[in-house]
């Protein structure tokens, strides 16, 4: 049994390159216009071990690692009204995904 706070990660929004850049894409995407690994509304539980949830995108996990560790070890985000959660995103500049990461009550 771990000692960290459990978290929930919710996939809030997926964007395409066109959503961000319009018709002036900096590169030509080779893959689908939206992330095909995650679905809007999908939820993942980060257990008290801190391991990446099964089925979660490794790229996004790397991007959320600081937020996850901060919340799991008791940190808060004072600049939010809800200091026990934060909006975060992956750094795929062509097909980004927005997340809500929140502490679960014990």
Question: Can you annotate each of these PLM segments?
Answer:
Residues 60-106:
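Short, compact, well-ordered microdomains
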Residues 2-6, 94-96:
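A general secondary-structure signal for short beta-strands and their flanking turns/coil
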Residues 10-12, 47, 102-104:
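A structural detector for beta-sheet-dominated domains
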Residues 8-24:
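Short, basic/aromatic beta-hairpin or loop at an interaction surface
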Residues 22-50:
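Short, flexible N-terminal segments of the mature chain
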Residues 51-62:
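Short, Lys/Arg- and Gly-enriched loop/turn segments at beta-strand edges
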Residues 15-17, 50-52, 105:
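Residues that cap or initiate secondary-structure elements
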């Amino acid at each position: 049994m771990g000692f960290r706070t459990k978290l929930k990660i919710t996939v809030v929004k997926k964007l395409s390159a066109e959503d961000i850049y319009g018709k002036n894409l900096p590169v030509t995407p080779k893959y689908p216009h939206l992330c095909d690994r995650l679905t809007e509304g999908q939820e993942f539980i980060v257990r008290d071990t801190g391991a990446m949830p099964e089925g979660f995108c490794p790229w996004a996990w790397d991007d959320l690692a600081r937020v996850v560790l901060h919340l799991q070890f008791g940190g808060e985000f004072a600049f939010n009204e809800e200091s026990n959660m934060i909006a975060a995103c992956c750094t795929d500049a062509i097909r980004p995904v927005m997340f809500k990461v929140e502490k679960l009550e014990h």
